[in-house]
Design a protein with these regions (language model features):
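All-alpha prenyltransferase/terpene-synthase fold signal
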Residues: 1-245
Length: 245
């Protein structure tokens, strides 16, 4: 957006550098707005103190996850465990676990923190794994993104890491030189999809999603948790992991 604005208006200097700098500043501004929204939310000072701690931890974890994601791409290597760590920090914690803990704090229900963590962490990871599958095998007419977008972007996902581990030498070489190539054709993407399927990686990831979802739902059996809340959270878990978009 900012880079395009620079080019369209013939601004001085480098358009790409302007775009990157402007995007970073916009991200900084969004963090300021998030703080302001919390301060102006109407919660009490005591509630604010408790929530602010969770809020800061959530942002720390998110930034760490984003950095690890960038680092994986720069290293150009694949590791299932490292990719899973990225999934946990980049998505699992901030998208599900921390918001639940945030709500528990506001409701004075910190006694449920362990239950919410036991539910949120595996579900958050499963949510990211489903996103990874859709990023390679998703239907463009449903997702709104070209098939194989994650391959073109060179994302070192758990799915890609598992494929690298279990495919043969030729498949590994093709994956290695193809990941991050923005010019991959539909035919190229189809060839990479076949490698991922034949290596067993897709089946393994689907199995892992099921295991993580089952683990998350089992945490909802806590007798301290209201049955209606447990039902809503279970439905959310199914929607989050069985989605097609």
């Amino acid at each position: 957006l900012f880079e395009g604005m620079h080019r369209e208006n013939s601004y001085h200097g480098d358009a790409e550098r302007f775009g990157i700098a402007s995007a970073i500043l916009l991200g900084d501004l969004a963090l300021v707005w998030a703080d302001r929204a919390l301060v102006e939310s109407g919660i009490t000072q005591s509630e604010f103190i408790h929530c602010q701690t969770i809020f800061c931890e959530m942002r720390d974890e998110l930034m760490a996850g984003q950095y690890l994601d960038v680092l994986e791409g720069a290293l150009g290597t694949s590791s299932v465990e490292r990719s899973r760590k990225v999934a946990r920090y980049k998505s699992g914690k901030y998208s599900i676990e921390r918001p639940l803990l945030f709500g528990a704090s506001l409701a004075g229900a910190e006694r449920l923190n362990q239950t919410y963590s036991s539910f949120g962490l595996p579900l958050g990871e499963a949510f990211q794994l489903r996103d990874d599958v859709l990023g390679i095998f998703g239907d463009p007419s449903v997702t709104g993104k070209p098939a194989g977008d994650d391959l073109r972007e060179g994302k070192r996902t758990v799915l890609a890491a598992m494929a690298m581990e279990h495919t043969d030498a030729a498949g590994k070489a093709l994956l290695d030189r193809s990941l991050g190539n923005p010019d991959l054709s539909e035919k190229d993407v189809a060839a990479l999809q076949e490698i991922i399927i034949s290596s067993g990686a897709l089946e393994q990831v689907e199995k892992l999603i099921t295991e993580l979802t089952t683990s998350a739902i089992s945490a909802l059996r806590d007798p301290q948790l209201d049955g209606k809340i447990a039902k809503v959270l279970e439905e959310m878990a199914i929607i989050a992991t069985q989605r097609s978009v």
